[in-house]
């Protein structure tokens, strides 16, 4: 929708540039403006090159442009800016197109793998993990919405020391009958405590790691049974949050199929590896890193970083775009890995680094045994959501209230996490996240439910004339609906899911302003009533597509 308007503006602008004898790429030269539907600042970019005042440059381009056509009503010269405005035909087309399904899917193509969550199989997810999961899953949904063929992937760290500690714990301690990931965590924490009290036992964990890497059949069964058991519990939490992975890749795959050996040989051929105390290391001092990257321990076992390089090589060979979501504590190692990949001529991943999310009560740690799990957080938010739904809809039965509370709780958690730019730390506060009146997920969900209610009360919608929608609230809402594909396109390109969260809030705001000031069911004459019903249906579809892309349920009644 909006991209069609932008494409026509680009054509008009390019015609003006060509007539002026100017060849300049139009990327990032057009943007939304409070004073117009689109505005270009291209004159500022050309001014120093042409050694002319930006106003004069803009005037030359403006005077050389062709006439507006299908989607562009007019262009205006305002100082150094050229502003563009949507035509009535375009606005009518938005409302008409938004009645169907095709409007909400992009035209991109190509394969993308997005690796996210990838928590160690040693316990349940905590709030820090789920910021990774929510950001990652929302990126997956945005890329799919843009048209890409996307695979969501979980990388299982089955060869790490934490997993070996779990295996040792399962050999020496009993698993309780709680949710699998929680049961594994209790064994892990108890094993960690024993190791602290009896450090000599750590040699047994080292031996487990060595035997697993050498593919000892008995040990392989133990490791994979423990890891799969933990992941089965983690999956239940993720599914509760509408998060699903398409595939799981295990670290061990890349050791056993020779990929890690191949990476080590490639790195040694660079002439940049050194042996230090028996360990093979990659010297990255020329690239500005003080510490070398350890590739293989003195005992011959590989490290997470080496296996990760093999995994990245596999991804680069099998997908056109490679995206991974990592916590801020991975910044250094991620930079080192990307440097190593560059040295080998392997395509680098697009990395989304997120800062941490916390609760008002403090941080969480699996090793110390003091953490607030994602399950506990979701249970508490759902309990509070149930109280709010009961207060608002006491006449509804228990099943309805429980169902809505579950959808509202997950929406509240997901939205509150994703609304903040990934590079900013945030604190989750359920009171703010569950506020139905403020700009939160429940506010957006309620806007969708309100649109559904209006449509249900109206019954069958006859044909309508979108040209009757002419007041400020109607036009503002139509323009916001049109922006959906632009927001998806930019968020997919820049991997910034918070942009879609912002759009969802603005769309709900525009819809509620329209609803407040423009009667729908009581509108007269009937032609205007039908036109506004058409706009309500377009709004419902836009809200539904937006919430779906955010991984948030869109209840028809709240």
From Swiss-Prot:
A motif ('HIGH' region) lies at residues 119-129. It is found in: Cytoplasm. Keywords: Aminoacyl-tRNA synthetase, ATP-binding, Cytoplasm, Ligase, Nucleotide-binding, Protein biosynthesis. It catalyses: tRNA(Arg) + L-arginine + ATP = L-arginyl-tRNA(Arg) + AMP + diphosphate. The keyword Ligase applies. GO terms for cellular component: cytoplasm. One of its GO terms (biological process) is arginyl-tRNA aminoacylation. This is Arginine--tRNA ligase. It comes from Methanothrix thermoacetophila (strain DSM 6194 / JCM 14653 / NBRC 101360 / PT) (Methanosaeta thermophila).
